[in-house]
Swiss-Prot record:
This is Acyl carrier protein. Keywords: Cytoplasm, Fatty acid biosynthesis, Fatty acid metabolism, Lipid biosynthesis, Lipid metabolism, Phosphopantetheine, Phosphoprotein. Pathway: Lipid metabolism; fatty acid biosynthesis. Carrier of the growing fatty acid chain in fatty acid biosynthesis. One of its GO terms (molecular function) is acyl carrier activity. The gene is acpP. The modification O-(pantetheine 4'-phosphoryl)serine is found at S36. It comes from Nitratidesulfovibrio vulgaris (strain ATCC 29579 / DSM 644 / CCUG 34227 / NCIMB 8303 / VKM B-1760 / Hildenborough).
Amino acid sequence: MSVEEKVKKIIMDQLGVSAEEVKPEASFVEDLGADSLDLTELIMAMEEEFGVEIDDDDAQKILKVKDAIDYVSNKQ
């Protein structure tokens, strides 16, 4: 499973959204209905899955699906 597929699966599991909704340009808050707690849980799930630490400044910049995929890909 690729990084992109793993990130998308985490998003689907954490936010309870379908694969069709998890597009690269989708905003976590505006398009996928995430709130601040959802975003925190999403960051924690990605940290655990990929063994990376995402600091608060970086976490605030992860606003869309593509941002999350790019961030994790660059940390691998």
